[in-house]
């Protein structure tokens, strides 16, 4: 039996350049050109880890993502992800067109869908116009 990690990359439908770059790198087992919610709702998974870096900034309400990851995975697992940090109570569409999410909002999703928050750290994620964008790094267990 050959057991190895499986890596999937979701590419939004309008991001052809991103898809081409990912193909050139040849590091992903599968490139998926589909909306993440649609994909999560049609597949059954057996993953230990779901890792989502710089993905949730393009999704405002994360309820469906949290619900589908937990309900469509055969066993418990871990969800690691980054968000742009918002100091309010929920999520917010920034001028950049990206969403930011508050820790309080993520904690509410954890309570609603049965995740345990194992790690949260505020970190600078990237520079935009010579200013750091603050983010949250999360590790959840379910």
What are these regions (language model features)?
Residues 1-39:
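Class I SAM-dependent methyltransferase SAM/SAH-binding core
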Residues 28, 46-48:
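Local beta-strand N-terminus motif with an aromatic residue
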Residues 51-52:
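A conserved beta-strand element that flanks and buttresses the S-adenosyl-L-methionine
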Residues 57-58:
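A short His-aromatic
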Residues 63-78:
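A short glycine-rich, Lys/Arg-flanked "PGG" loop and its adjoining helix->strand segment in the class I
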Residues 80-99:
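Short, glycine-/aromatic-enriched active-site segment of Class I SAM-dependent methyltransferases
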Residues 98-114, 118-120:
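Short alpha-helix
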Residues 113, 124-142:
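Core SAM-dependent methyltransferase catalytic element
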